[in-house]
A protein has these predicted regions:
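Class I S-adenosyl-L-methionine
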Residues: 7-171
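Short, small-residue-biased leader/transition segments that mark boundaries at the very start
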Residues: 2-6
Length: 171
């Protein structure tokens, strides 16, 4: 099984657990968190856990970014958002850009990279975040993007709720 593989490679301290990341409480601190195709907001919960655990490195390959697709509204973007496929793809890109901004707000140097050629899978975005220590003061940028799109992304709710103005809380 998988346990034998990682033991043969010298990773005896590595463990695997099957379950819902949102409720996982098995560790207090980690060096690195890797997520691969955690669907929709599962990526957000995994990123929030990674930040909470003080992960020095986060490597995340998001998948199925449906959350914003159902929330995005903007009169100026209406002519674009009327096309479901375009709106879906833009929602995925906005989701990952917002995730990167939140991680920077939490003190990570963040990059969004293509990690595999498009011919293999369209889900080829890697969010790479390395802990820098000092948070980036980008709350106004976060406020602008969530306000522009009229969205409440899960990762913002979990790690940067101050990005919402008082008026937003009344919605």
């Amino acid at each position: 099984g998988l346990g034998d593989v990682y033991k043969r490679q010298g990773y005896e301290g590595l463990s695997f657990t099957c379950g819902d990341i949102a409720g996982y409480e098995g560790v207090d601190q980690v060096d690195m968190v890797v997520t691969l195709h955690a669907c929709d907001t599962a990526t957000d919960y995994a990123l929030a856990k990674a930040v909470g655990w003080g992960a020095k490195v986060i490597l995340s390959v998001p998948c199925c970014q449906h959350e914003l697709n159902g929330q995005m509204e903007n009169e100026l973007m209406g002519p674009v958002f009327q096309y479901g496929l375009i709106k879906e793809r833009m929602a995925a890109l906005y989701t990952d850009a917002i995730r990167a901004q939140v991680l920077e707000h939490m003190g990570y140097r963040t990059q969004i990279l293509e990690f595999i050629d498009m011919e293999h899978t369209p889900k080829n975005i890697l969010i790479r975040a390395v802990k820098q220590g000092s948070p980036r003061n980008n709350i106004n940028e976060l406020r602008k993007i969530v306000g522009f799109l009229q969205v409440r992304p899960m990762l913002v709710q979990l790690l940067a709720p101050e990005a919402y103005t008082f008026r937003d809380c009344l919605l």
